[in-house]
Amino acid sequence: MKILLLLIPLVLTACGTLTGIPAHGGGKRFAVEQELVAASSRAAVKEMDLSALKGRKAALYVSVMGDQGSGNISGGRYSIDALIRGGYHNNPESATQYSYPAYDTTATTKSDALSSVTTSTSVLNAPAAALTRNSGRKGERSAGLSVNGTGDYRNETLLANPRDVSFLTNLIQTVFYLRGIEVVPPEYADTDVFVTVDVFGTVRSRTELHLYNAETLKAQTKLEYFAVDRDSRKLLIAPKTAAYESQYQEQYALWMGPYSVGKTVKASDRLMVDFSDITPYGDTTAQNRPDFKQNNGKNPDVGNEVIRRRKGG
């Protein structure tokens, strides 16, 4: 039984596979992070309902939230080394005997008919021999359990990757093409489509219990879109949202493993605030709603309603 208990820690020591999951997306993405970001963005774009734009020529405007940031996870993984540790020491009694050398000194004094003899014994201040005896038994017992992680995390400064925005824009254009909607320059479009990407990044978390541990990396893409007819200035697609998240998780037992690795893609929580409930003011008609028609592809024209209010009408 004792041999078995000794072999188990030896077999399990340093058993593990480390995946360097970063604390925040951006900069140089690694393979799993790329897969998650691509999956969440593809799922969100694929959910967009573009049926109202069938047969139209659309000018596409995509705006993405900035994703600059940094991550900080100090220290390694959770260890229960400090929770289970004990020791017992028993030292025997010891006694030491020292032997100091002695020597005699004799002095004789004579004066006329009188004489005296003086004899003295002295001991050196350094022992000539020492003898130590121990009595009793000596014993030492200790018990402990050490489970150390297979990785460590340090401060990271991560930069935004402009290619992510280009990648997402290309995905949206691909879906438009596959749906039969032509994407053209603004001067040739009869429809303006606005896509606002509020969330486009990764979230890392770690679960640490006494027996169960997990590393989780999520990628989320949340966007809102709407479409406007250039001639009538009416909404062809009212503001709608699409939100998806993908997840990669490694599960451990006492940080040994992982014994389970999983990947999932699912719909996530919607935007905390969206524009689906915004309606025109009561005195605003279809003819003087704000005009999204753009002459140079950059600056929007000023609608009739805005001009009237500026004149104080």
From Swiss-Prot:
Lipid positions (S-diacylglycerol cysteine): 15
Membrane listed as a keyword: yes
Region (Disordered): 282-313
Any Gene Ontology CC annotation: cell outer membrane
Topology of this chain in the membrane: Lipid-anchor
Signal peptide limits: 1-14
Subcellular location: Cell outer membrane
Ranges annotated as biased composition (Polar residues): 282-298
Primary location: membrane
Lipidation (N-palmitoyl cysteine): 15
Keyword Signal in record: yes
Any one biological process term the GO annotation gives: cell adhesion
Key words, A-Z: Cell adhesion, Cell outer membrane, Lipoprotein, Membrane, Palmitate, Signal, Virulence
Family in the record: Belongs to the MafA family.
Annotated protein name in UniProt: Adhesin MafA 1
Originating species: Neisseria meningitidis serogroup C / serotype 2a (strain ATCC 700532 / DSM 15464 / FAM18)
Lineage: Bacteria, Pseudomonadati, Pseudomonadota, Betaproteobacteria, Neisseriales
